[in-house]
Amino acid sequence: QHNPARIRSSAAKVDKASLQARKCFLCAENRPPEQRHLEFEGRKERKYDVLINPYPIFPNHLVIARNIHTPQSIWHRMTDMTDLARHHPSFTIFYNGPKCGASAPDHFHFQACPHGLMPLEADIDKNIDLMQASGETPEALDYVTSVQDANLYHYGKFTRGVFVLTARTSKSMAKLFYRLVDCLPQREDETEPMFNLLCWYRKSPSQKLLGISHGRFGEYRAVLLA
């Protein structure tokens, strides 16, 4: 994760005056001509450009930017995040809030890296898999609540504000996520609480339904760090 050139991104000024004075580097017209992209369409025809991160901290580090200039805000976009995770199960999709590490808070974007690179992911996967195999909740996970097929846990092995969400469907994951976000403290001058979010899709072995083999069964997993 050593990339000295990343200081241009991580130390970028993100105050209102600085953002207005610079050209947005995520807008298509301001990107280098050699930077190509793939397209991804989210819900309600929201379109994204999938880009190689020019200042990576991971191998195969991606930026998934809206194809229009719109502020960084997770509202109404959680299902886009889960769809990205399901379509690309070998990646973890992550979101930095506008005041929580996003170097372009004026242009909405997710990021992605190969799943399993972060120790937190591996430990949470291990604990969830253990819980599902044994039927018992590990010490690291404290059950909080459920919404439909989605479950919320507090993760106790890191800082205090780490929550784990699991769900079988994108819709229930989004419902539970927004209920959790509604409980977080928020400053009056901010558009959303301060948090970072990881999301990935855990594929399950193919199952037979009405005699037909389906490989679509799996589980959405997310981690919110507040």
Regions found by a protein language model. Give the residues of each.
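Active-site microenvironments that recognize anionic phosphate/pyrophosphate groups
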Residues: 1-84, 91, 98, 103, ...
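Histidine-centered nuclease catalytic patch
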Residues: 106
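Phosphate-group recognition and catalysis centered on beta-loop-alpha active-site segments
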Residues: 112
